[in-house]
């Protein structure tokens, strides 16, 4: 199995963590990663752009002048697309831009992105990362200890509790940092809370240079992506 250094918030090595080769050390499939990002960006589009055709713009329906004997060009309507204030030919109309990707391809894309970070030595795993209260200064000090203070960094935390939520709030004022809580507390199946990694996505993992996970987050990712029966329910 692949191994990664386990660090504390002071940046000190406190151990070595074995991680799944199937999740963190596969040959990246860049085509599937592109498909995932294309799906993400397409699903963000509102699709509300709209223009009026010649049948929708205001204006009379009569012919502006006789067909012949005026010396002027032939026209049948002032709403023609070639007229000022006329309709728009082939303009945009509201449409649904959303795309879908099957679960196997989603999981392959996520494993590929995680493997890219691991192979480029841009994956940091902490034993834990919680703050007693939201304070940007505290999170900034932790990133300095990891030598990531001036790097674009994505932090992914496993669930919503007070300590992790304080980290998320603390990261809002740091321009190069994004904090994701990969959990949906409202999700349940048969009365039991299902394991999910909502929020973890390929676009953010590629956009940010470094990826910071907690030990619990690694376990959660491996539980969801480490077997074909798991469900990687992300955006």
UniProtKB/Swiss-Prot annotation:
Keywords: Ribonucleoprotein, Ribosomal protein, RNA-binding, rRNA-binding. Residues 45-75 are annotated as: Disordered. The keyword 4Fe-4S does not apply. InterPro entries: Ribosomal_uL4 (IPR002136), Ribosomal_uL4-like (IPR013005), Ribosomal_uL4_dom_sf (IPR023574). GO terms for molecular function: rRNA binding; structural constituent of ribosome. The keyword Metal-binding does not apply. One of the primary rRNA binding proteins, this protein initially binds near the 5'-end of the 23S rRNA. It is important during the early stages of 50S assembly. It makes multiple contacts with different domains of the 23S rRNA in the assembled 50S subunit and ribosome. This is Large ribosomal subunit protein uL4. It comes from Thermotoga petrophila (strain ATCC BAA-488 / DSM 13995 / JCM 10881 / RKU-1). The lineage of its organism: Bacteria, Thermotogati, Thermotogota, Thermotogae, Thermotogales.
